[in-house]
UniProtKB/Swiss-Prot annotation:
Chief place where the protein resides: membrane
Encoding gene, per UniProt annotation: nuoD
Similarity field: Belongs to the complex I 49 kDa subunit family.
The organism of origin for this protein: Helicobacter pylori (strain P12)
HAMAP family per UniProt: NDH1_NuoD
Record-linked Gene3D superfamilies: Cytochrome-c3 Hydrogenase, chain B
Name under which the protein is recorded: NADH-quinone oxidoreductase subunit D
Length: 409
């Protein structure tokens, strides 16, 4: 008996060619080593030029927002590590900041100092990681090796503080879990010196490298209008000349007390963005050097004092009956924030990372929404890549510094 087989034709989004002479459809990813995660791009080519780019995401979707709606507020904290996993502490802090805003908590000053140090340390680790991988994409392997060596020292500091090198879980709602270990600040000072030396070395290898500049200059140009229409933030926005940094515009923690600049670009191309990452490393070093002397002038508490939402110190839990009962209720049932909603933006290494939380007074959020910068930057590829050569697609994708843990969520 003859079998009827239905021939399946590939379907692409609105791909119609008037002339087939010099045109081609190319699938880029989702397993391509330069796609920086699970990115699939459907590229329409005319010769070597891209005439249309259609990003397809979702290959790393894990339902992170829905998970948050089915966990207590404290239970969800480790899950935030898995968003932008190259700077986990930034995710931890953004979530904690949103919950603290909802609870109207006052954070002890020592915890604020430690948090700001950790945020800027993570910013440097994330930036040096981007520069090394971006250079490797373009073909500069030596930079990758030197930068990763220095990054390891930063990861050692994070491991000394919280016990983890990648998924840190280093922030708590109401403060931080630990005080700084002995001699940790001395190790931090040494790391700052090593980071300066590494930055000089990288600049020596790249800034006057003719091939590097030819591959990046006038490639992946983003205009101010394009950046605003796509909702870009961070260096993708500042590279166009718009000086918008949430640490300056809506300061949190100790940023309003710190002296630092917001570098901006002139041309909005990939080379401008590389330069801004290098300049922001300098600003992070400058911020940490202001924070180190502040630490010694702070009192010892590292967690907020509020029995409705925050457990008492461990010594009180072990010696006082009421503190033990309060701790048991918070762990077993979870805190119950007031009814309301809040959106708290922060300046992560990638751009504006914010958490929206709608509370109905239950131990878990009624709605949790994550505003991740990489999601918007990947969407903008459909504009940025048009007119670029296929050989430059890897450079453009890399210069967005997107991490797919926070794109797909």
């Amino acid at each position: 008996m003859a079998q009827n087989f239905t021939k399946l034709n590939p379907q692409f989004e609105n791909i119609i060619f008037e002339h087939d002479d010099n045109q081609m459809i190319l699938n880029f990813g989702p397993q391509h080593p330069s796609s920086h995660g699970q990115l699939r791009l459907i590229l329409e080519l005319e010769g070597e030029k891209i005439i249309k780019a259609t990003p397809e995401i979702g290959y790393l979707h894990r339902g992170c927002e829905k998970l948050g709606e089915n966990m207590t507020y404290n239970e969800y904290m480790p899950t935030t590590d898995r968003l932008d996993y190259t700077s986990s502490t930034s995710n931890n802090y953004a979530y904690a900041y949103a919950v603290e805003t909802l609870l109207n908590l006052e954070i002890p000053r020592r915890a604020q100092v430690i948090r700001t140090i950790l945020l800027e340390l993570n910013r440097m680790i994330s930036h040096i990681f981007f520069i090394s991988v971006h250079a490797l994409d373009v073909g500069a392997m030596s930079v990758f090796l030197y930068a990763f060596k220095t990054r390891e020292y930063g990861l050692d500091l994070m491991e000394d503080y919280c016990g983890a090198r990648l998924t840190h879980n280093a922030i708590r709602i109401g403060g931080v879990p630990l005080d700084l270990p002995p001699n940790w600040l001395e190790g931090l000072k040494k790391f700052l010196g090593e980071m300066r030396e590494c930055k000089k070395l990288i600049q020596g290898l790249l800034d006057k490298n003719r091939i590097w500049r030819m591959r990046l200059e006038n490639v992946g140009v983003v205009t101010p209008k394009m950046a605003q229409s796509w909702g870009m933030s961070g260096i993708m926005l500042r590279g166009t000349g718009i000086a918008y940094d949430i640490r300056k515009e809506e300061p949190y923690e100790l940023y309003k007390e710190l002296d630092f600049d917001v570098p901006v670009g002139n041309y909005g191309d990939s080379y401008d963005r590389y330069c801004l990452y290098m300049l922001e490393i300098d600003e992070s070093i400058r911020i940490i050097e202001q924070l180190i002397p502040m630490y010694a002038k702070t009192d010892t508490p590292i967690m907020a004092q509020n029995p409705h939402y925050i457990s008492a110190p461990k010594e009180d839990i072990m010696t006082q009956n009421y503190a033990l009962m309060q701790h048991f209720v918070l762990v077993a049932q979870g805190m119950r924030p007031p009814v309301g909603e809040v959106y708290a933006p922060t300046e992560s290494p990638k751009g504006e990372l914010g958490f929206f939380i709608h509370s109905e007074g239950e131990p878990y959020p009624h709605r949790l929404k994550i505003r991740a910068p990489s999601f918007y930057h990947i969407g903008a590829l459909s504009d940025i890549l048009v007119g670029q050569y296929l050989a430059d697609a890897v450079t453009v994708i890399g210069s967005t510094n997107a991490v797919f843990g926070e794109v797909d969520r």
